[in-house]
Amino acid sequence: MIDEALFEAEEKMEKAVTVAKDDLGSIRTGRANPGMFNRIGIDYYGAFTPITQLASINVPEARLVVVKPYEASQLNAIETAIRNSDLGVNPSNDGNLIRISVPQLTEERRRELVKQAKSKGEDAKVSVRNVRRKAMDELSRIQKDGEAGEDEVGRAEKELDKTTARYVAQVDELVKHKEAELLEV
């Protein structure tokens, strides 16, 4: 019972870190990166579909992204979605593919993006801590129901604290790397 609670908590913490990694990856840096487009999508036959599933996205140069839709009919919709996104880029459509020149970030914009990265990191740490709290409640319930002794639950709580600290440190490291990447000129 205790092992199941710890395993489930660790699994959920891992998911929180994965979501944080994806969120941080969607924040654009000064370089072109296909991950910038992970959160952009269009209405495709009645369903919201990410453009990463509707087009090939290549980075031939450090500041250039080329988006080639699998269906030519989706070209304008994809271009509009990119233009309306919060990426701050201006796509150009040549009839077959979309070229996106990624401009250099201003110092002010870099600072805003660092704040955004820290905010997303903090959200991830809150998620990890919420998982810990729920697992602690579960351990208390196990002890109260007499399914495990006080010593076993105490050891499990210490193990849970170590696991929580490890995942919080992973999130901190992700944010630190993203911050360094954003501030690099």
Curated annotation (Swiss-Prot):
Keyword Protein biosynthesis in the entry? The reply is yes
Q: What is its main location?
A: cytoplasm
Compartment(s) of residence: Cytoplasm
Q: Where do the record's region annotations for Disordered lie? A: 140-161
The protein's GO terms of the molecular function aspect are: ribosomal large subunit binding
Transcription as a keyword of this entry, yes or no, is no
* Entry keywords, A to Z: Cytoplasm, Protein biosynthesis
Q: Which stretches are transmembrane?
A: none
PANTHER family per record: MITOCHONDRIAL RIBOSOME RECYCLING FACTOR PSEUDO 1, RIBOSOME RECYCLING FACTOR
Q: Which NCBIfam families match?
A: frr
Full protein name: Ribosome-recycling factor
Instruction: List the gene name.
Output: frr
